[in-house]
Amino acid sequence: MNIKDHLSKVTEYFSPKVIGEVNDVYVKVAKIKGEDIPWHNHKDEDEAFFILEGELLFEEEGKDSFTMTKGDFYVVKQGINHRVSAEKECHIMLIENKSTAHTGEVESHVTRSIEEQLK
Amino acid sequence: MNIKDHLSKVTEYFSPKVIGEVNDVYVKVAKIKGEDIPWHNHKDEDEAFFILEGELLFEEEGKDSFTMTKGDFYVVKQGINHRVSAEKECHIMLIENKSTAHTGEVESHVTRSIEEQLK
């Protein structure tokens, strides 16, 4: 299936949807707009970001913030506090362990259960 | 780093290069042109394909062959014999377990060790 068809089913910002299962990881797509994702980390889990469309502001502790654009690929390593936001709508692909909570241990109004992400 | 920069370093067809490590998986890019990849399977490992540019002919046992185009995402499940080829140069992203041999247990002239893929 094309990534655009998967994205067309995403109706909420910050709400990742699983598009594939590859061994112990889920591949997901999400749409980001705004600053609603809280600072968080994934204690034992790396998380990969790939920009499909638009621009994503990436903030990571101990680093200068940087802007990711279409085609950029970045892995935030386990345990590192980070936050992503976007002024305009941005489409991303995520590669995460199945066990990864997308906002880490931080519960916020954008937090979605894995069941919701699998719908 | 942008996927185009990673791809610009790929000088051989069928020779995947690791662009990121996410927990137990490697994310790779590769360029495909021709029919040199042998039929193979990955006994215990799923393998994800994402088309970055061009068209990829996907053949999988028990299915009609199909053509993947830019933005298409597909996971071939563990143990299923498959083969990919491309008439014109095609750029792909792969998501594979670190332990996955890219041509399965089949050794061919395109087979590359993980050390070569990490260079």
Predicted regions mapped to residue ranges:
Chain A
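Ligand-binding loop in jelly-roll beta-barrel domains
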Residues: 78-106
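Glycine- and acidic-residue-biased ligand/ion/polar-headgroup-sensing regions
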Residues: 25, 44-57, 61-62
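Short acidic-glycine-tyrosine-enriched beta hairpin
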Residues: 62-79
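A short, N-terminal "cap"/entry segment at the start of jelly-roll beta-barrel domains
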Residues: 1-29, 107-119
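A cytosolic small-molecule/anion-sensing beta-strand core signal
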Residues: 23, 52-53, 69-70, 88
